[in-house]
């Protein structure tokens, strides 16, 4: 017998009685500027259907207009009654109560949210060596910042698991904070001591700090990659469980980002295996089409957003490959390198299961400088989690310099500026982008954004392999 903690995703047959377009004035303006038409995916889920399943005893946790459904909590009696509803097309189990009763062992949890702050005590000394700008230098981002483009006018979302002290951290520009939403069951203070992973990722984008050793010559700067961008925070990670329900939380965040008119969403999360093995993905599922997260990523791209997603830290583990939603098409998945540009051994491998180059880009994810939300000092940590926001902020700065560009034009310029663009690699992808080159490229040769996979070669263990052309997808992320 199922308990009230069993969670399902219900997919409805249609949107009868729905006449609400779920887009803010800001989002509508963005759509108009970019010529993106309103379609059925922009309309809310039928309120009639939501009322009906609520009256049957289900608790609606959140809805999905893109997938025309709702994530609900229900017991067996309620779900049997819902099965009789003609407007319910499909029912998916996403979490059972067995995995809610105890926090699973750390080894079974997402590696992406495991961070290390072992160098926190050395933070200020690291800055004295000029470490605070190293990750910007590697991306050749400083010339764009010096030209005055630091993400102003660009709205960035961060989807993560906790934002400890992000509401008060001195190094963050709080006047640029747009708001936050908790899409989890935790319903705890997202700024409390329930996780700082999101805060660390946020500092890589918007934090700014001047550091001095007491002399004029000893003044140094920590800077994020888009210190003038506005930002919105989404908590999508459940602390006690690892289940597909978290993917539904994330999809809800991406849909909300679209409704708010955000330009970019940075996601340092990934999914491969879960607390209950029958939910697990296989590598074959990392095809940009199987998970709702990957499908939602493609829809977001069609709606004008640029999603930037961490590849994962499985390169030296049994899984080895990328996670979802990093497998999605039309996004930027991000691998990790060190300060010398060498690939981090933990950075997950591509390509996607259907042969597309993954990751698209790399940034510093080994020894990344961040601001500690605990005490506002500069620390270093490792993970594609921290390479990801560097690229998200870089894209925001580039977009602020080219405000008329589309999301796919920004994506393509970034990819084409990479140092391995002509010979992508299974861990580097197209390599490390050159921001200034991407910017200057736009003034001379705006890229053909329809050419999403310009090369079908990849280097594996020093050998050259020829890949088949990546599949194309329709707006729902289904393979054509």
Give the location of each predicted region.
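Substrate-binding/access-modulating region of protease and related hydrolase catalytic domains
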Residues: 145, 151-152, 168, 233-330, ...
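Catalytic-core environment of secreted peptidases
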Residues: 171-178, 339-385, 422
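Subtilisin-like serine protease catalytic core
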Residues: 90, 143-181, 185-246, 260-263, ...
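Inhibitory N-terminal propeptides of secreted protease zymogens
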Residues: 8-108
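Hydrolase catalytic cores
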Residues: 236-237, 321, 365-428
């Amino acid at each position: 017998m199922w308990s009230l903690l069993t969670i399902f995703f219900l997919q409805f047959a249609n949107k009868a009685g729905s006449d609400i377009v779920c887009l803010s004035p800001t989002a509508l303006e963005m759509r108009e500027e970019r010529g993106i038409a309103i379609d059925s995916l922009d309309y809310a889920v039928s309120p009639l259907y939501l009322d009906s399943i609520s009256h049957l005893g289900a608790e609606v946790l959140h809805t999905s207009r893109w997938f025309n459904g709702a994530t609900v909590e229900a017991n067996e009696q309620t779900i049997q009654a819902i099965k009789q509803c003609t407007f319910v097309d499909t029912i998916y189990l996403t979490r059972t109560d067995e995995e809610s009763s105890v926090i699973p062992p750390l080894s079974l949890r997402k590696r992406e949210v495991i961070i290390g702050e072992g160098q926190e005590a050395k933070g200020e000394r690291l800055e004295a060596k000029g470490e605070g700008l190293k990750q910007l230098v590697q991306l050749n981002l400083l010339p764009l910042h010096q030209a005055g483009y630091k993400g102003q006018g660009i709205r960035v979302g961060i989807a993560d698991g906790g934002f400890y002290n992000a509401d008060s951290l001195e190094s963050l520009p709080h006047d640029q904070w747009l708001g936050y939403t908790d899409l989890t069951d935790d319903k705890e203070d997202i700024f409390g001591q329930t996780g700082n992973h999101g805060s660390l990722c946020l500092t890589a984008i918007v934090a700014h700090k001047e550091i001095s050793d007491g002399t004029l010559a000893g003044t140094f700067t920590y800077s994020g990659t888009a210190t003038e961008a506005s930002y919105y925070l989404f908590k999508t990670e459940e602390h006690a469980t690892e289940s597909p329900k978290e993917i539904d939380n994330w999809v809800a965040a991406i849909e909300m980002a679209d409704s708010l008119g955000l330009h970019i969403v940075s996601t340092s999360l990934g999914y491969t295996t879960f607390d209950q093995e029958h939910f697990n993905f296989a590598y074959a599922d990392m095809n940009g089409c199987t998970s709702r997260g990957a499908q939602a990523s493609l829809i977001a791209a069609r709606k004008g957003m640029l999603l930037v997603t961490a590849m994962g830290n499985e390169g030296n583990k049994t899984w080895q490959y990328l996670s979802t939603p990093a497998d999605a098409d039309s996004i930027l998945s991000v691998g990790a390198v060190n300060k010398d540009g060498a690939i981090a051994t933990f950075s997950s491998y591509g390509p996607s299961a259907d042969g597309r180059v993954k990751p698209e880009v790399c940034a510093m994810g080994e020894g990344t400088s961040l601001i500690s939300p605990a005490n506002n000092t500069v620390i270093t940590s490792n993970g594609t989690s921290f390479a990801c926001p560097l690229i998200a902020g870089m894209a925001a700065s580039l977009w602020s310099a080219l405000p008329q560009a589309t999301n796919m034009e920004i994506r393509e310029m970034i990819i084409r500026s990479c140092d391995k663009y002509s010979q992508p690699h299974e861990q580097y992808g197209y390599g490390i982008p050159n921001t200034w080159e991407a910017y200057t490229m736009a003034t001379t040769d705006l890229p053909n954004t329809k050419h999403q996979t310009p090369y079908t070669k990849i280097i594996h263990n020093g050998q050259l392999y020829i890949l088949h052309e990546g599949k194309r997808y329709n707006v729902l992320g289904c393979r054509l």
